[in-house]
Amino acid sequence: MKIDLLLIPVGARYPEMRAAARAAEDAGYDGVWTWDHLRDPDERAEAGVPEAWTTLTALAEATRRLTLGPLVLNTGLRHPGLLANMAATLQQVSGGRLLLGLGAGATRSMSYAREQEALNMEVSPDRVRAERVAETAQVLRRLWTGDESSFVGTQFRLDRPSGFLRPDPPPPIIVAGFGPRMAGIAGLHGDGFNTQAMHPNLAELARVAREAHAASGREPARFSVSVFAGLSERWLRAGTPERARLERVGVDRLILLTSPPYDLGGVRLR
């Protein structure tokens, strides 16, 4: 099982994120992630949130070995054509270390949705947001592989696209969610599924995702299941009940969240 860190960006400054990523690399962690949010969900005016993609691009130059990714990109914030080029470019900058996490964004009832509402950006219904994730993954693959055929979905359309940057290799697409609908989308259109480590239905969601992936006709061995949890000893140490549960489910990657000011001593525990 790979062990990664997620650097929560709320209230952080890039120099401390860079220092934490380098400490994680030195400590033997496998990857670093960050959130994709526009502001602090608690609306603290002084906090601020560094933009995810800019941060990841800078971290690609600041590290050598770590995989890098957003956990996860809100597909309501970027058109998939723009995202395809962003991801292809970061794949070049990082030397092929990108893991592209995609998510549906927040529901209207969640505090995270207020960042979009404050900018007069639409917060779509659940069905629309789920469709957007599925179609974003399809559009990305078409543009990355040079497929010039037209695409007509419910959320996006392509008119014989050509000439877009093609990453080599294309980054894996990791779809995050907390229910069977998103697990199914992850299996059908993604290369991996991500959810909470303590999700009560973790085994069932992993099964749904894997079965959907097998039904898509793609290689089952290439599909991954990852989870996230807070950085603590019970997740860092092998052999704990928490780690044993993940192993029974077949989790491939554990992503541990840490907040600023980042405890570099804690980061070095592994």
Predicted regions, residues:
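Active-site-adjacent structural elements that line small-molecule/cofactor binding pockets in enzymes
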Residues: 1-270
